[in-house]
Design a protein with these regions (language model features):
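Alpha-helix N-cap/helix-start motif
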Residues: 45-46, 63, 110
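Extended, low-complexity intrinsically disordered regions enriched in proline/Ser/Thr/acidic residues
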Residues: 2-31, 66-163
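Short cysteine-rich clusters marking metal-coordination/redox-active sites
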Residues: 33-36, 53
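Short beta-strand-initiation
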Residues: 19, 38-39
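Canonical RING-type zinc finger of E3 ubiquitin-protein ligases
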Residues: 39-48
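Cys/His-coordinated zinc-finger cores
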Residues: 51-66
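Short beta-strand-alpha-helix junction that forms the catalytic/metal-binding core
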Residues: 47-53, 84
Length: 163
């Protein structure tokens, strides 16, 4: 949908989105920045699906919108598409994908935060070796999935397990 063809958001819808966002940042997994682990997540990368502190949000913005699309939790109006993405993901699932091959709970030292973020998202240094799943609930398991022969680039990974 093009920008020009979007209908204006109603006040009720904007208020509902704001309430949902405030509730999401209160969840234990979203209270800390997905990247540096600091408190006060007032920003989010809606396409990655993670909540961020102000410092890390600036680094995300500097990577460009082809990597990360940042919005304020408090100041911006969120579209239904953006809300759907941030609600499906959250920090736990986002880090299950982007930090799959990194020690759990890793927090980079202050002087290395920018290089850590760029390695994490631009270079995909610790990411799963599978495409980003359409349904992030597949990441709710504790073990990273290896790519399968049926995984196509750009498509969600398929399971080889029997039902």
């Amino acid at each position: 949908m093009s920008y020009a063809s979007r209908k204006p958001q109603s006040r009720a819808e904007a208020d509902a989105h704001a309430r949902t966002l405030r509730a999401l940042v209160k969840l234990p997994e979203n209270k800390h920045c997905a990247d540096c682990k600091r408190n006060d997540t007032r920003w989010a990368s809606w396409n990655i699906g993670c909540f961020l502190c102000i410092r890390c949000s600036g680094i995300h913005r500097s990577m460009g919108t082809h990597i990360s699309r940042v919005k304020s939790i408090d100041l911006d109006i969120w579209t239904p598409e953006q809300m759907n993405s941030i609600q499906k993901w959250g920090n736990k699932r986002a880090n299950a994908y982007w930090e799959a091959h990194l020690k759990a709970g890793h927090a980079p030292p202050d002087h290395k935060v920018e290089s850590f973020i760029r390695s994490k998202y631009e270079l995909r240094r610790w990411a799963r070796q599978t495409p980003i799943p359409e349904d992030p609930s597949v990441l709710d398991t504790d073990t990273p999935q290896a790519p399968t022969a049926t995984t196509q680039p750009g498509a969600p990974p398929t399971s080889t397990r029997s039902a």
